[in-house]
Curated annotation (Swiss-Prot):
Catalytic activity annotation: oxidized coenzyme F420-(gamma-L-Glu)(n) + D-glucose 6-phosphate + H(+) = 6-phospho-D-glucono-1,5-lactone + reduced coenzyme F420-(gamma-L-Glu)(n)
Phylogenetic lineage: Bacteria, Bacillati, Actinomycetota, Actinomycetes, Mycobacteriales
Protein's name according to its UniProt entry: F420-dependent glucose-6-phosphate dehydrogenase
Any one GO molecular-function label of the UniProt entry: coenzyme F420 binding
Function per UniProt: Catalyzes the coenzyme F420-dependent oxidation of glucose 6-phosphate (G6P) to 6-phosphogluconolactone. Appears to have a role in resistance to oxidative stress, via its consumption of G6P that serves as a source of reducing power to combat oxidative stress in mycobacteria. Cannot use NAD, NADP, FAD or FMN instead of coenzyme F420 as an electron acceptor. Exhibits nearly no activity with D-mannose-6-phosphate or D-fructose-6-phosphate as substrate.
Length: 336
């Protein structure tokens, strides 16, 4: 079994840049091994939302912490970004913070790409997935440090070189919500990312088996692939507060089609706020008892996940981190 790791999800859609940095610093002192950040150009919510630039945040946190592993969860290197430039950015961070940087990638959402000028119909999954695979190939070629002439279907480089690259390049984590991309993560990813709250069948019977299948097809050791899950947890000793804290993140309870196709945060907010709190809370582990919380988290370890990244929905993240350090972290370490 791979090493058990605990991480903190820095909610870039919810907090301003300076506050988000300070929270990551606190997360390290609370016992977290890693901190991940989403890369949104626009937030899920128009009112009260935020969208700081993820790579600037990672650099600021890197300077303020000693051992915290930092990565995106996730970034789309295929539309508003040129993957060659993302490869350069992550190579630079990898040189600044050796062994502490990874690139988490996904296929993208209209919310972030339409606003920045993507023209035409938002592509179907097939094209978005093809772009992702091609971008990963290009970035890895560039991280070898050689001059790269790349002539792909979507991306091209001519005599491109990245001059400052950490030894071994940058680990790439692939986000997957279904078995097709999970199999690709097993075949080509250094890590795999998924999110919680969708039932045992998805994780134990689809995602993890697909990762293992992909690894076997590529003659890789599946246990060497870091299997990360963003655990949506609203833990507070006050049960009413634990429930109400989930409200801000109602957009997560929209359908996958809505989340991938709505391109306006105002419309996203309207759709989310129409949901009852009971439906919103279904995506979360809502608990006021630490043993109950850890028991529910422990299911994901049994299903094959080893890197648990905790996403707390409340506005008082300092309170969550204090409670995490006091009540949850000691119990969670025993899951190993």
């Amino acid at each position: 079994m791979a090493e058990l790791k605990l991480g903190y999800k820095a909610s870039a859609e919810q907090f301003a840049p300076r506050e988000l940095v300070e929270l990551a610093v606190l997360a390290e002192s609370a016992g977290m091994d890693s901190a991940t950040v989403s890369d949104h150009f626009q937030p899920w919510r128009h009112e009260g939302g935020h969208a700081p630039f993820s790579l600037a945040w990672m650099t600021a946190v890197g300077e303020r912490t000693k051992n915290l592993v930092l990565g995106t969860s996730v970034l789309t290197p295929t539309f508003r970004y040129n993957p060659a430039v993302i490869a350069q950015a992550f190579a630079t961070m990898g040189c600044l913070y050796p062994g502490r940087i990874f690139l988490g990638v996904g296929t993208g959402e209209a919310l972030n790409e339409i606003a920045t000028g993507y023209a035409g119909e938002w592509p179907e999954f097939k094209e978005r997935f093809a772009r992702l695979r091609e971008s990963v190939r290009l970035m890895r070629e560039l991280w070898l440090g050689d001059r790269v002439d790349f002539d792909g279907e979507y991306y091209r480089t001519k005599g491109a070189s990245i001059y400052d690259v950490p030894e071994g390049g940058i680990p790439v984590y692939i986000a997957a919500g279904g078995p097709v991309v999970a199999k690709y993560a097993g075949r080509a990813g250094d890590g795999f990312i998924c999110t919680s709250g969708k039932g045992e069948e998805l994780y134990a019977e689809k995602l993890i088996p697909a990762v293992k299948e992909g690894a076997a097809a590529a003659d890789r050791d599946a246990d060497a692939i870091d299997r990360m899950i963003e655990i949506k947890i609203s833990y507070d000793t006050d049960p009413e507060l634990a429930l109400e804290n989930t409200r801000f993140w109602a957009p997560l309870s929209l359908t996958a089609e809505q989340k991938h196709s709505i391109d306006d945060p105002i419309e996203m907010e309207k759709a989310a706020d129409a949901l009852p709190i009971e439906q919103v809370a279904k995506r979360w582990i809502v608990a006021s008892d630490p043993d109950e919380a850890v028991e529910k988290v422990g299911q994901y370890v049994k299903w094959g996940l080893n890197h648990l990244v905790f996403h707390a929905p409340g506005h008082d993240q300092r309170r969550f981190l204090e409670l995490f350090k006091r009540d949850l972290e000691p119990r969670l370490r025993k899951l190993a």
